[in-house]
Amino acid sequence: MFEYLIKFYPKILFIVEGTLVTLKYSVIAVIFGLVIGMLLAICKVNKNRALRLFANFYTSIFRGTPLLIQLSIIYFASPYIIGVKFSVFMAGAISFSLNSGAYVSEVIRAGINAVDKGQFEAAVALAIPKFLIMKDIILPQAVKNIFPSLVNELVNLVKESAIISMLGEMDLMRRAQIVSIETYNYFFPMFIAACCYYILVMLISFIAKIIEKKMIVN
């Protein structure tokens, strides 16, 4: 077994290097997804019916269709729809961010609705602008309540980012596939990739628990 590992060490290193690519897509998607989700959530709780309809329609589209199809449309159909050919990186970043934003919006909306309405009414009575009420009073409490759900979304992004390999991006999955073809051994490369995904998820969960404990103390 030890000799086997020594022999395949360069291949193992090649696969593990794909972790950085996977992390890159996940981090970008969770950042932009959080921004998009927050804006959509605010639209969903807004009194303006047009904003609510738009936000709900957006969410229904991205939650109601497979991420693989969304990625394919953005990458392959964008030249025909908007006249722009996206790179693999841009197509992946855009599709993951838009998809994440739809799911995050529902999480944040639920968090906003969970905050005691009396606080909003009291702030309005004190003539505090609604923007500041949302920014300084409602959202901080909502984010604290939904933090575990946001972490779960990041974990899902790490795993779902594997579909970018379909476009030839050299992420964990794609590198494992290449090594599998080169060595005619499909178990070992996929096992290494699975271990990398597992370690990433466990690391994210560990860091999230530390942050959550500090949030509870504060």
Curated annotation (Swiss-Prot):
Its main location: membrane. It is a multi-pass membrane protein. It holds the Pfam family BPD_transp_1. GO terms for biological process: amino acid transport. It comes from the Bacteria. Residues 19-208 form the ABC transmembrane type-1 domain. The keyword Cell inner membrane applies. The keyword Transmembrane helix applies. Keywords: Amino-acid transport, Cell inner membrane, Cell membrane, Membrane, Transmembrane, Transmembrane helix, Transport. SUPFAM superfamilies: MetI-like. Belongs to the binding-protein-dependent transport system permease family. HisMQ subfamily. Part of the binding-protein-dependent transport system for glutamine; probably responsible for the translocation of the substrate across the membrane. This is Putative glutamine transport system permease protein GlnP.
